[in-house]
Amino acid sequence: MDRQDMLRVIGEGYAARVRGDVEGVLDVFTSDAQFKLNAVPQKAPVSLRTEGTNALRQAMTQLVQTFEFQKLDIIDAVVEGSKAAIRIRIMVRSKQTGNVAETESLDLVEFRDGKIASYTQFFDTAVAEQLLMPTAIKMI
């Protein structure tokens, strides 16, 4: 799998996430894929680790029900062998509070047999916490 193929698969997964299409997201993952969102659980209750299609479906369904990705852009991508590091910018809206924020994340992706076998996302827990707060405090 070359760089272009890997970025195409990653892009398909991101596009499905923006659409809120859980099954479309699952289509780019292997059946035993590991999926991790790394965050401090006390600050952002979306920290999670899953393995396999059923666990990923449950987690992704919960994420789609909680956070709407209004826009997602790939800023940088580094591909080496079967691995990729992707920096993305996301406009996110909390479906619980209506709060909106723009943030960036770093996604580490590993491929096997043309699909994502491991996906780890690092994101700003302060932004996630702000999105989930019932009333956001604005600093002046």
Regions found by a protein language model. Name each.
Residues 10, 14-17, 29, 60-63, ...:
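Hydrophobic alpha-helical core bundles mediating ligand binding, dimerization, or RNAP-core interactions
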Residues 17-27, 49-50, 68-72, 92:
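Phosphate-binding glycine-rich loops and adjacent basic patches that engage nucleotide phosphates
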Residues 3, 30-81:
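A solvent-exposed, acidic/Ser-Thr-rich amphipathic alpha-helical stretch
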Residues 1-5, 64-140:
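A beta-strand edge to alpha-helix "cap/lid" segment located at domain peripheries
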Residues 1-31, 137-140:
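Short, low-complexity N-terminal intrinsically disordered segments enriched in polar/charged residues
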Residues 13, 25, 33, 52, ...:
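Hydrophobic pocket/interface hotspot
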